[in-house]
Amino acid sequence: MRSDSDRARFEREILPHLDAAYNLARWLLRSSDDAEDVTQEALLRAYKFIEGFHGDNAKAWLLRIVRNSCYTWIKSRPKTEAMSAGEEGEFDPAHERALAEAGHSLPAPDARLIAAADHQLVNAALERLPVAYREILVLREVEELNYKEIAAIVDVPIGTVMSRLSRARELLKQNFLHGDR
């Protein structure tokens, strides 16, 4: 059983990065449901090994656990099992009502459609990237991590992070400009 100090440390240092953990899992697994499962598993692992965390970057430590959990999950799946494209950009009436009730103005329907179409194009271009490039791009551009943090998570030298990021950006550009629309 964990001590109260371990629990408090976990809540203070690890839980604030829950969204980043889910986002990484979502991009690597291409499925919201699978990302939720893997994120929960990764959080359990992080909690179990919290006393082993002696670093100063809890986000990088957690994202490395999430990344490893994602790859373990992928390896455990049958090769023929397809990963879904996910639900990004879908209309969610409950979410729309909650935003309206909270006093947030909603964009016009045509603006929402254009934004959703743009979102789908970017997502489709990202989905076509090899996972090694996609993870680097997501960690840098979505999670806004620096090269050193990404290198620690992915367990490669900083130079490799830089070259993969450059290549990922170029491939994303090609996918976006020349990919299936």
Where are these regions (language model features)?
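A short, charge-rich alpha-helical start-of-domain segment used by transcription regulators
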Residues: 1-23, 33-36
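Residue-level preference for hydrophobic side chains embedded in well-ordered alpha helices
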Residues: 13, 17, 21, 42, ...
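Structural recognition of an alpha-helix C-terminal capping motif at a helix-to-coil junction
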Residues: 37-44, 48, 56-68
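Arg/Lys-rich amphipathic alpha helix in sigma70-family domain 2
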Residues: 67-86, 101, 115
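Acidic, proline/glycine-rich intrinsically disordered inter-domain spacer in sigma factors
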Residues: 91-127
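A short pre-motif secondary-structure segment
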Residues: 136-140
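DNA-recognition helix of helix-turn-helix
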Residues: 142, 148, 154-178
